[in-house]
Amino acid sequence: MSVTMREMLEAGVHFGHQTRFWNPKMAPFIFGHRNKIHIINLEKSLPMFQEAQKFAKQLTANRGTILMVGTKRQARELLAAEAQRAGVPYVDQRWLGGMLTNFKTVKTSIKRLKDMKAQQEAGLESMSKKEQLTFTREIEKLEKDIGGIQDMNALPDAIFIIDVGFHKIAVAEAKKLGIPLIGVVDSNHSPEGIDYVIPGNDDSAKAVALYARGIADAIIEGRANAVNDVVKAAAPEGSDEFVEVEESAA
């Protein structure tokens, strides 16, 4: 789960935006500038990223759900792959307005998608070719819009966002509902309202991969801890001796 300073350097996490586009509220996290590009202070970014990982791990250990969001071109595939690896919901194409604040309607769309997929698996022979084409196109659209959240039965307990400025609608919805935010904040955006700020480059594919992998690792580790706690709670007295017998039998 641990991320090192060297990994951050190699991923280009320290490269911010052009100095003329900076947000003064990011001043505490900026080391300086080079060739009119702000340099983000990794001595601050690293512990803040680790704090975000710790939060993600603890939340998941307590059976909380984290929604991962990254719809920028360079983030889509990377984020979707890591979310799938961690077994959590994700949004990788576009954020639909009301995805959180109007979740009741979104759940209706999710049910529609699941029903249509079940119908597709059963066979569409009773439909005309034109009807099949229309049906398939609707499924494809629903998959693109909400496929990553089709197993999310309730609002998430936290949201991880790559580029809070690009996803300002998602940020606003989360804040309105009081859902904690883990956010990658570049030098041109404001960290205000983000519960766990990760100051860093939000454009580099390598940096995006690092953030997504780090949070996914924390989620997986947290879930493993939750499973271990359940096993320990269910184990009868004298279970240590029982485990030793199992090991010797193996």
Swiss-Prot record:
CDD domains xrefs: RPS2
Gene Ontology process terms (BP): translation
Gene Ontology cellular-component annotations: cytosolic small ribosomal subunit
GO molecular function, one term: structural constituent of ribosome
Claim: Ubl conjugation is one of the keywords in the record: no
InterPro entries in UniProt: Ribosomal_uS2 (IPR001865), Ribosomal_uS2_bac/mit/plastid (IPR005706), Ribosomal_uS2_CS (IPR018130), Ribosomal_uS2_flav_dom_sf (IPR023591)
Pfam families to which the protein is assigned, alphabetical: Ribosomal_S2
Keywords: Ribonucleoprotein, Ribosomal protein
Domain of life where this protein originates: Bacteria
PANTHER family: 30S RIBOSOMAL PROTEIN S2 PROKARYOTIC AND ORGANELLAR (PTHR12534), SMALL RIBOSOMAL SUBUNIT PROTEIN US2M (PTHR12534:SF0)
Protein family (similarity comment): Belongs to the universal ribosomal protein uS2 family.
Protein name: Small ribosomal subunit protein uS2
Originating species: Paracidovorax citrulli (strain AAC00-1)
Organism lineage string: Bacteria, Pseudomonadati, Pseudomonadota, Betaproteobacteria, Burkholderiales
